[in-house]
Amino acid sequence: VSKLIILAIFSFSFQVYSRAPGTYAQMRYDIDKVSQKNLISIINDLVKVSAPSRMIGLPGHDKARDFILDSIKAYDKKGAGKIIVDSFSPDVNEAERFYQADFNEKIEGKFSPTHPDYQKWFKFTTYMKQTAQRLKSFQGTNIIWEKSGLNAEKTLVITAHYDTISLDPNTLMIDEKKPMPGANYNASGVAVCLSLINLLSKIDLNYTVQVVFLDWQGVAFLGSHHYAQELKKSGKNVLGFLNLEMLGQDTSFFDKTKKTGNMSVYYRPQDEKFVQALVHHGSQITNKIAFQMKPMGFENSDNIRLWEQGFLGGTFSQNWEEDFNPKFYQTPQDTPETLNHQTLYSAYQYLGGAVLGTLLDITK
């Protein structure tokens, strides 16, 4: 069940809010109008207002949704785009299928039923299926900011989930009583998306853009499952998508290569041409960060649901192979103080370049 509520439609083709940059240098000037201080304040405010957790069914979850809506209206004061609040009933049958299929593919037949790994993942699978059933009365809410371009038929999509989940690393069970600030997971992605709205709302674009704040990521990616299905039904000509997940974790201490600024973009071989263009645009804006191209797929974020519906794209994230710190992942330690603020801001600049370069066909 989907209920679309259009809160504001103020886009008119004859309105001009600012010049459209025609070069990378001009683009950088516009991108830098959002400061590092602005970006970090979004994370601090979101974590504070939604404390102790943004998990489905808890008060902080609804507060996070309202925070995002209020922030969009504040950044797009002139209504250059429209806000679509897409409320949906979670497809718990799909959640059960998702977890069972994952277990069947990776565990069943590969381990004896008495093996500890089999037992661990069997319990997890059963538990998550039960969790989906337990939470099914809580509607999900995807928030979409859409701004039309000169060629409105072509659409670029940027996504980031805003809910959190806290899992015990040993039992893999959800601990709802534990605080889960979710600064990196995924207030970082939300903050970059809101900053992109701040940027894009003031520039005339060649193509339409959707910036999407996804719900229900923590349970079978049901928010992106719903969004991707609706996007497919719409018949839009989608250029591709950028999924933003955990952009603030970057250390030299834990990094196997002892470097910072080495982030990753995960995609499939068929996404390479689209992702390569994004990387080219982004790298023209800043050299303080690099998103290494990794055509290995990615199973830990909402990109999988968009891939299921045939869309091209990838997930921009931290370096999961060389600088993944489990101490902060889905734990109470995931606080704003643990983030690398310089890397996060550089990620915003880079992604701003990737997005604007695509939407404006920048070549020089």
Name what the model sees in each region.
Residues Q26, V34, N38-D45, P59-S71, ...:
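Extracytoplasmic/secreted proteins, especially bacterial periplasmic and envelope-associated proteins
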Residues Q139, S166, K177-P269, E299:
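Acidic/histidine-rich catalytic neighborhood of metal-dependent amide-processing enzymes
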